[in-house]
Amino acid sequence: MSAATATAAPVPPPVGISNLPNQRYKIVNEEGGTFTVMLCGESGLGKTTFINTLFQTVLKRADGQQHRQEPIRKTVEIDITRALLEEKHFELRVNVIDTPGFGDNVNNNKAWQPLVDFIDDQHDSYMRQEQQPYRTKKFDLRVHAVLYFIRPTGHGLKPIDIETMKRLSTRANLIPVIAKADTLTAQELQQFKSRIRQVIEAQEIRIFTPPLDADSKEDAKSGSNPDSAAVEHARQLIEAMPFAIVGSEKKFDNGQGTQVVARKYPWGLVEIENDSHCDFRKLRALLLRTYLLDLISTTQEMHYETYRRLRLEGHENTGEGNEDFTLPAIAPARKLSHNPRYKEEENALKKYFTDQVKAEEQRFRQWEQNIVNERIRLNGDLEEIQGKVKKLEEQVKSLQVKKSHLK
């Protein structure tokens, strides 16, 4: 056979394997997606404004002035907001987990416990649903991302921030965020970021970072990888952490005839989607546009599987000093009674009940003593009256004797 004949052989038609991504796209587009994000941080850091700006719609209403004047909550609450968003015929079920009351008290000891319990409960609930015979419709509220809002003090992280992030980072994808970054100058912001990164590294707090291996880094530098732009984008996101954000839901004219979402000050505008002003666009890319599936898959393959493995192996809580992962030995249904904050309230209620019982017992003893004293007084009065009656009877007898003598 000649070389010309060999090269002229017909190329077989494709079998259709390359069409698999299109099939997958169709399935995902029909099923839609679910994304659950937890907002953690002190009150007044713009969490509600940020989430509304992120999805460009009003998912949560801001607390009114009347609500802000209510007494400070003694415990951390869990507030769940659900919404169905649609963009280009694709539906995304969004669950926003807010944590009002976190960090608002003078004593914030164990303030992170309700957050940790909630994340563990969702893992446990999903695991129990997987063990059921019929699993066609599973309710999934597992947290895919935790946005931890840091107050822009310019100094560093507070102990409650460090402890809470350490606890959350072993259970969910933790993303630290510097709130209200426009209150710091550019130099102060960079120094603040550097301090936070140093503390995160020293405390071995695991934060979510875009996947970036060593080979990808080299390819990005040389430009040999066709995905080098994506790798470079991931590197920029990593360098920008913790993200400095500014929140606003109002639009203003930027002086060029364009309406932009911004915060207006006497000296000018702080544009939300301007990379030179804040990191909002980078955080949005991490959460939605570029790495949403990575957040979901990491939750499933790492955090949930870790919880499931430890639960099935019967591991118990290894103590406060374990920095890897601590799994409560008790069932989630009984966690409430073992929560340290509820323990404090339980002890306070027991003390109050004991004090009330003692007060009532003291009151009854005093009442009994008063009755005894009254009985003694009445007996004395009765004896006195009986004595008077006896004397009167003797006098009557004496008079009767005298009367008989006179007759």
Curated annotation (Swiss-Prot):
Q: Where is this region: G4 motif?
A: 179-182
Keywords attached to this Swiss-Prot or TrEMBL record, sorted alphabetically, are: Acetylation, Cell cycle, Cell division, Coiled coil, GTP-binding, Membrane, Nucleotide-binding
Q: Which InterPro entries match?
A: G_SEPTIN_dom (IPR030379), P-loop_NTPase (IPR027417), Septin (IPR016491)
Annotated Septin-type G domain ranges read 31-314
Residues annotated as region G1 motif?
Answer: 41-48
**Region G3 motif: which residues?**
98-101
Role: Septins are GTPases involved in cytokinesis that assemble early in the cell cycle as a patch at the incipient bud site and form a ring approximate 15 minutes before bud emergence, which transforms into an hour-glass shaped collar of cortical filaments that spans both sides of the mother-bud neck. This collar persists until just before cytokinesis, when it splits into two rings that occupy opposite sides of the neck. The septins at the bud neck serve as a structural scaffold that recruits different components involved in diverse processes at specific stages during the cell cycle.
Q: Which family does it belong to?
A: Belongs to the TRAFAC class TrmE-Era-EngA-EngB-Septin-like GTPase superfamily. Septin GTPase family.
Q: Which PANTHER family match?
A: SEPTIN (PTHR18884)
This one is known as Cell division control protein 12
Native species of this protein? Saccharomyces cerevisiae (strain ATCC 204508 / S288c)
